[in-house]
Amino acid sequence: MVRVKICGITNLEDALFSVESGADAVGFVFYPKSKRYISPEDARRISVELPPFVFRVGVFVNEEPEKILDVASYVQLNAVQLHGEEPIELCRKIAERILVIKAVGVSNERDMERALNYREFPILLDTKTPEYGGSGKTFDWSLILPYRDRFRYLVLSGGLNPENVRSAIDVVRPFAVDVSSGVEAFPGKKDHDSIKMFIKNAKGL
């Protein structure tokens, strides 16, 4: 069964509802320019209230390794998602201390070729935009198919919502799906009915 990550969590209510609805992971965005930014202090307050089996992921964009690792330890993260132009050497350095998920924006085959450079890590494929995720826009999932089996763990993101997530899973067959804007009432606040329906459709319940 596909795993589900609810990203852009900014409050405990949304985090707990996501978990109770069947989410496997929650994501905190530590990129200050994001509309879904959360401070490490607020993220920690949420993290310590979550059940131990919930995967906690921190999203960073072109951040210094020391800062990433400090925040990861403080918030009690299980993984970090590197969503910028982080070179592979930096990813490897961080991966010595914590699981790294490398995000790659996709709009064409060249982007898929670039993603292959990071295939030693779990890969998150997102729609390529200047905002580094959370755009609400999909990309052409068929671009993934010639490369699909070359990734060990593939996470699909980018414009997913309760209406299209089942089709996306049927086409791509990812290890996990990641959603942020597709289950929001507005940036930073989730719509609980959308979360419930997204997870239900993703997991085929």
Curated annotation (Swiss-Prot):
Pathway: Amino-acid biosynthesis; L-tryptophan biosynthesis; L-tryptophan from chorismate: step 3/5. GO terms for biological process: L-tryptophan biosynthetic process. Its EC number is 5.3.1.24. The keyword Transmembrane does not apply. It comes from the Bacteria. The keyword DNA damage does not apply. This is N-(5'-phosphoribosyl)anthranilate isomerase. It catalyses: N-(5-phospho-beta-D-ribosyl)anthranilate = 1-(2-carboxyphenylamino)-1-deoxy-D-ribulose 5-phosphate. Homodimer. It comes from Thermotoga maritima (strain ATCC 43589 / DSM 3109 / JCM 10099 / NBRC 100826 / MSB8). CDD domains: PRAI. Signal peptide: none annotated. Keywords: Amino-acid biosynthesis, Aromatic amino acid biosynthesis, Isomerase, Tryptophan biosynthesis. InterPro entries: Aldolase_TIM (IPR013785), PRAI_dom (IPR001240), RibuloseP-bd_barrel (IPR011060), TrpF_fam (IPR044643). Pfam families: PRAI. NCBIfam families: PRK01222.1-4. GO terms for molecular function: phosphoribosylanthranilate isomerase activity. Belongs to the TrpF family.
